[in-house]
Amino acid sequence: SERLRYLIPFGQPHEVIEYLIRVADEHPGAVTVFGDDGEKLGTWPETHKHCYHDGWLERFFNVLVENQHWLQVTTFSEAIDHTKPVGKIYLPDSSYREMTEWALPAEQLVEYDRTVHELEHDPRWPAVKRFVRGGFWRNFKVKYVESDEMYSRMMNISRRLEQAVQAGAPHEIVDRARAELYRGQCNCGYWHGAFGGIYLPHLRNAVYRHLIAADNLLNEAQGRPERWIEAKAEDFNFDAAPEVQLANDRLNALIAPRRGGHLYELDVRSICHNLLATITRRPEAYHRKVIGGGNNGNGSCASIHERVVFKQAGLDQRIQYDSYPRKSLVDLFYDHGVTLEAVAAGQAAQRGDFVGGEYEAKLRRNPDRIQVLMIRDGQAFGMPIRINKGLTLEIAYLLEGLPQDRPLHFAVEFNFAGMPAGADDRYFYERHPEQQPEFPNRYGQLGTRLDLSGAQGLGLVDEWLGIDVGLTASQPTGFWTFPVETVSQSEGGFELVHQSVAVQPHWLA
């Protein structure tokens, strides 16, 4: 019962009884079902005071006792055992109403909300609202490509698990891998609505942590040697186009040649962490509320579906959308005088067609290494340019066709996720290409904007995670860094969330 979901605990206890009386009058002997999150009774914002200090829960139990002469509290199993079936019904693929609304694309959700609010004042609404529904849950995998990336990774590991079972792999290892796979299927990080969901980095990181752990165990079950490397080209994300996987005993990399030649997953096996569990900033229907401001009005305890709370000031000024995915090996051409501020704000014009353009990919296998070579003949500033980028888990770029009479401003973006800002044990430092000093020069926390020139390299450290990422260049290079932050909604309200660190080495080529 959707009505009970909103009345418990946000309505008065007597309103619950009044609703149940109406149901009993219209349908004698009916079973009314309430099933919802236990967090509503004390964990969600303001509900602990409401339920316990203000006495809602005690008053609710009291009215149930007072009406027990006609109202029986029961369980699902008891209802099945003692209630005669009324008939047969087949349910479609579905979820609760709000979830189907959240699955809609942002612009359609805005139109849906507007239409529903208009129809609510129509006298026919009580009769027709049951026929009004939103979207399909699986559309979350289209609305958020990051959800689809997790889903695709999960499905491929599930397939590997089945292959291991069929091959007679050791049961103990297979069982551990299966448990990790199931943990990686926890749905919370795959969608987004009134809850933080996919916008919460710790949920995405947790999904990948378990999936990578399962992958590692399956490598063990397969009996791989201590040192190994492999490369495969197949449709890993079910988009009818081949991706490339480079993997060894330490790392796993997934590259999408037809989507800008981006590196979209980079797993560090030893800590079960995907450095590219990033998210791209996109419009959300609720951003209208952030821009408009507001609150839930009377100060009473409100459902999270109705609350408008800002966890930080000035969030309307922090909303920003990305014009390309926040991944790595993103090839960018800028005007000469572009600034870090313009790049970080997404206001720097793109002068090339390489950001999302299709690259031709080739796998090169040698006895001592495997390389993915990606080539695109495109344009920058109206001139034909060829970019060759080779990835061996060491990256090499060759730009051909550069004009002789003018330099071009070229940058490559990398993103690093799961390395939060705002902590002294997570920081940038000066990276040296040869001998690294014991105590390198620090540039500040990972949320710092840096505009470095003539640098040989840049390092990023997360001491808590236990990782040191180093970028070194073959010649002095400019480095830009800036945080990627979203304004998103959770049960606590609207908040600014650090998602990744963007690093752009850039050159006048």
How should these model regions be labeled?
Residues 3-251, 256-260, 268-271, 464-466, ...:
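Active-site and substrate-binding clefts of carbohydrate-active enzymes
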Residues 189, 199-202, 206-226, 346-355, ...:
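Terminal, compositionally biased non-globular sequences in eukaryotic proteins
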Residues 249-362, 373:
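Acidic-aromatic substrate-binding/catalytic surfaces of carbohydrate-active enzymes
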Residues 349-382, 392-404, 454-509:
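Beta-strand-rich recognition/accessory modules
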Residues 385:
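Extended lipid/amphipathic-ligand handling interfaces
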Residues 412, 417, 425-437, 447-478:
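Surface-exposed interaction patch
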